Amino acid sequence: MKAAYIVGTDTDVGKTFICAGLCWALKEKGYNIGYFKPVLSGAKRRGKMLIPQDTEFVVNFAKIEGDIYRLTPFIFEKPASPHIAASDENIDINVYQIKQTFEDLSQNYEFVVIEGCGGLAVPLKEEKNQFYMQYQLIKEICNNVILVTTTKLGTINHTLLTVEFAKAYGLCLKGIIVNMYKNEPDEDKVINTIAKFTNIPILAKVDFINDFPSDVDENKFKNVFKKCFDDRAIMKIMGVFEC
């Protein structure tokens, strides 16, 4: 199977935006792309329905076929760590179900983009005083990681800590995507520092869009993705998709 697990250095680094752009760009190149977000917290209500808004955005933007509730089997309204949100709602995050859903999806698509819920060290569930962490799920379904980061103050520390955590727990971190790039004077210095310390390829720099997510202008997004996920970037990214 061919898939990549997208995680972030922190909350609000734009994983969903990157996943949407990556799925769209690969579809534009003619690839059959699937999307999977096993767990989502902070879901929004639309009437009586709880909507996995990240999944809905990616599926609609990239024109991916699939039921959003199948693509995101565990959805919680509370904007909290999954193990807390699940406990509050008395729901068990069934890891076997996640694995089975991923296996089923992988039969239908050439490549699958998996979006994590936060970073590597996020607890997904707690059972008998034992935590099951996101990095454990990654190792069990697709040890093939792309890290999304930014260039904001503090990102060098966050990125290096994430990379060292990945190494310590045997994760295969194959590339870094820098989001919210503004082409300001010190940004490339930050990116070069990260590249030198980690020796991990910088797969792409994705331009900052000021209006996201309040203004969903598809043409604006597509212009950014055409530029940032050009043929050279796509070739580097395609080398990651191998579980």
Swiss-Prot record:
Alphabetically sorted, this entry's keywords are: ATP-binding, Biotin biosynthesis, Cytoplasm, Ligase, Magnesium, Metal-binding, Nucleotide-binding
Subcellular localization is given as: Cytoplasm
Q: What is its EC number?
A: 6.3.3.3
| Associated pathway | Cofactor biosynthesis; biotin biosynthesis; biotin from 7,8-diaminononanoate: step 1/2
One cellular-component annotation, GO:
cytosol
> Where does the UniProt entry say this protein principally localizes?
cytoplasm
One function term, GO molecular function aspect: dethiobiotin synthase activity
Gene Ontology biological-process annotations: biotin biosynthetic process
A Pfam family this protein belongs to? AAA_26
The UniProt record gives the binding positions of substrate as S41
| Residue numbers binding Mg(2+) | T16, D54, E115
Superkingdom of the source species: Bacteria
Asked whether the UniProt record includes Magnesium among its keywords, one would answer yes
- Active-site positions, per UniProt? K37
Residues reported to bind ATP: D12, V13, G14, K15, T16, F17, D54, E115, G116, C117, G118, N179, M180
Q: Where is the signal peptide?
A: none
Q: Which SUPFAM superfamilies match?
A: P-loop containing nucleoside triphosphate hydrolases
Catalysed reaction equations from the record? (7R,8S)-7,8-diammoniononanoate + CO2 + ATP = (4R,5S)-dethiobiotin + ADP + phosphate + 3 H(+)
Q: What are the names of the required cofactors?
A: Mg(2+)
The record's family statement is:
Belongs to the dethiobiotin synthetase family.
What quaternary structure, including any partners, is listed in this protein's UniProt entry? Homodimer.
The record's function comment reads: Catalyzes a mechanistically unusual reaction, the ATP-dependent insertion of CO2 between the N7 and N8 nitrogen atoms of 7,8-diaminopelargonic acid (DAPA, also called 7,8-diammoniononanoate) to form a ureido ring.
* Alphabetical list of NCBIfam families matching this protein: bioD (TIGR00347)
Protein's name in the database: ATP-dependent dethiobiotin synthetase BioD
Organism per entry? Caldicellulosiruptor bescii (strain ATCC BAA-1888 / DSM 6725 / KCTC 15123 / Z-1320) (Anaerocellum thermophilum)
Its ancestry begins with: Bacteria, Bacillati, Bacillota, Bacillota incertae sedis, Caldicellulosiruptorales
